[in-house]
Design a protein with these regions (language model features):
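Short, hydrophobic/proline-enriched secondary-structure or compact coil segments at domain edges
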Residues: 20-23, 88-92
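Short, surface-exposed linear patches
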Residues: 45-46, 86-88, 102-104, 112
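Mixed-charge, glycine-accented linear interaction segment located at domain edges/termini
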Residues: 94-150
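Short, surface-exposed, polar/charged, turn-prone segments marking secondary-structure boundaries
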Residues: 50-52, 90-93, 118-119
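Intrinsically disordered, flexible peripheral segments
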Residues: 80-85, 90-91, 97-98
Length: 150
């Protein structure tokens, strides 16, 4: 199972406006706040769908952005997904400006990734989940059939 969705209605106001999001990777699921400062819910849904489509059509890596303020913000968050054959390996990632070398590339945020790592610089194992390309294709199909955004 692979799924990314937005839950409920926006909460907060101004630059603290957000909506809850959820990712499902096999049996794992995580809920997170999705800021609505610069991007609207439809922007996230469109980015997720576009990234998933690129992945199932052969892209070796994509990033599903889940925390986007503006390209020059203090940080961004997303879920990089590396395709290895029929398997997709997914990690959560914090993108910091000093690691990006400039504003984040919204069209192709994966350009900021580098190779997939399983051990952090501190020597700790990086959490990683495995789904299949078929799981990601099913996500695309569900989103294409649904009139409800992510």
């Amino acid at each position: 199972m692979f799924d990314l969705e937005l839950l409920g209605r926006p909460e907060g106001e101004g630059d603290r406006l957000f909506i809850w999001g959820r990712i499902r990777l096999g049996q794992f699921q995580d809920e997170f706040q999705v800021p609505l400062y610069d991007w609207a819910p439809g922007d996230y849904a469109a980015q997720w769908l576009e990234a998933a489509e690129r992945l199932i059509h052969g892209a070796p890596v994509v990033v599903f952005l889940t925390h986007m303020m503006h390209p020059t913000a203090g940080y961004h968050m997303g879920w990089p997904a590396w395709r290895e054959g029929d398997k997709v390996l997914v990690q959560e990632r914090l993108f910091l400006p000093e690691q990006l070398g400039g504003p984040i590339d919204l069209e192709h945020p994966e350009t900021h990734l580098g190779p997939r790592q399983e051990i952090s610089d501190e020597g700790l194992r990086i959490s990683q989940w495995s789904v299949t390309v078929r799981d990601v294709a099913a996500f695309v199909e569900r989103r294409r059939r649904s009139s409800v955004p992510a």
